[in-house]
Amino acid sequence: LKLAIGESGTIFRYSNHENTVLNQIRVQLLESDEVDKQELIHFIESITKRKDDEHEGERCMVDLCEVYKNYYFDPHTKGSNSIKAVLPAMLRRSMHLQEKYAQPLSDINVTSKNFSKSHTWLQVLNDEVQDPYKMLPPVFDQWTNEELDQLSDIEDLNNGGAALTAYGFMQYTDMSDQEREALSQALKKYCELDTLAMVMIWEGFREVCVVKLNNIR
């Protein structure tokens, strides 16, 4: 993570999960014998906040969920602040997102380690923009019924609860290498969309701000 985000620039998160997990890792590092523990602890402290001692890092992550709750509302979310509700609502409303993500990845300069270059994130069915989370492929796509009978109960991996369950199964359940690989690939696709969802929401906010600024001028 430290290498991926570099030394400058704004870091976004959505809600508390990332901040909570990083603070848990900080506690683990404090009790560890890792050679670079101090460097990693300093990095974590620079991008997180803590309630117990009111610490807030100089490069603290910006919570897009708080931005949404304080400055934006879309009735399509039906009152939910979840990223799973905000993303499809933003896609339905934003012309920029519709024009950009209706194109294959190869045409919009978006790289992916888990989807093909021809993959299109925005799909329309019966004139309705589809929820990208619901368009994620089934975990065990193209498996036979006989093979499926031997597997765990996870069929779709498109929400945080299913992702945590799948990760737990991989850690503590005796399963075939084939099933473990299928769950691993599904988790990677889900996590990639979770990350891209924050990019899309930020792009949607930016579009709204540009329109409002132009109207003021």
Region spans (language model):
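DEDD superfamily 3′-5′ metal-dependent exonuclease/proofreading module
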Residues: 1-217
